[in-house]
């Protein structure tokens, strides 16, 4: 059990789905949570985590799914009953709307903190936590409210390319093989 939110934790999720190869899950990430911590402090950030956990717990009862706090500001909804793609998609769309600029009243500060979420969805995939994580990363990268994992995402190849170019650039910088080119910027009067 997660001590802060009293929700099940990642270990419980892994135990709950270990025998179910094709469970559907949604990873839920609170957008710009670091900004909340920096602006209001960690204790207020914790209050936001607790409130989001309460909302997700109530939401999970409506759809008969399980809710978990995985780590930090990431939660998970898991459907082990195989409600199907369309029903799970309906759940996701409703959740995305529910958290669109969701005001959370923080009584201790007498303020509303507005929260948005991004979701990564894995529907009936093997390694559902991993594939939902890939989908979450893709949603965040493309500034989407949610993304549903599909097998067309070839992340291994993408990661290999990224690693290749990262090493190539590091080596070029280290060996002083980078030649910078500059172009002067002029205003309309041709002043630099």
Predicted feature descriptions by range:
Residues 1, 5-24, 31-58, 68-77, ...:
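Conserved long alpha-helical elements within nucleotide-processing catalytic cores of c-di-GMP signaling
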Residues 18-24, 62-64, 122-127:
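Short glycine/proline-enriched coil/turn segments at helix->beta-strand junctions
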Residues 25, 75, 115-121, 182:
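A structural signal for short, well-ordered beta-strand segments
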Residues 78-82, 100, 124:
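Residue-level recognition of strand-loop junctions within catalytic nucleotide-signaling folds
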Residues 12, 16, 160-192:
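Active-site core of bacterial EAL-family cyclic-dinucleotide phosphodiesterase domains
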Residues 58-64, 94-111:
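Short catalytic/binding micro-motifs of nucleotide second-messenger systems
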Residues 94, 107-111, 116-168:
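Cyclic nucleotide signaling catalytic output domains
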Residues 63-66, 181-182:
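A short linear hydrophobic-aromatic micro-motif
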């Amino acid at each position: 059990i997660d001590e802060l939110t009293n929700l099940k934790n990642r270990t419980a999720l892994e135990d709950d789905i270990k025998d179910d190869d094709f469970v559907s899950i949604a990873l839920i990430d609170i957008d710009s949570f670091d900004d909340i911590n920096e602006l209001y402090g960690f204790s207020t950030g914790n209050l936001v985590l607790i409130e989001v956990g309460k909302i997700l717990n109530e939401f999970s009862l409506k759809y008969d799914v399980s809710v978990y706090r995985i780590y930090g500001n990431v939660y998970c909804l898991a459907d082990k009953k195989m409600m199907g793609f369309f029903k799970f998609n309906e759940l996701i769309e409703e959740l995305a709307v529910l958290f669109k600029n969701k005001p959370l009243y923080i009584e201790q500060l007498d303020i509303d903190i507005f929260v948005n979420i991004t979701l990564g969805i894995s529907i009936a995939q093997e390694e559902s936590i991993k594939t939902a994580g890939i989908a979450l990363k893709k949603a965040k990268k493309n500034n989407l409210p949610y993304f549903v994992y599909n097998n067309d995402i070839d992340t291994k190849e993408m990661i290999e390319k990224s690693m290749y170019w990262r090493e190539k650039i590091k080596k070029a910088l280290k060996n002083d093989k980078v030649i910078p080119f500059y172009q002067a910027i002029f205003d309309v009067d041709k002043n630099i």
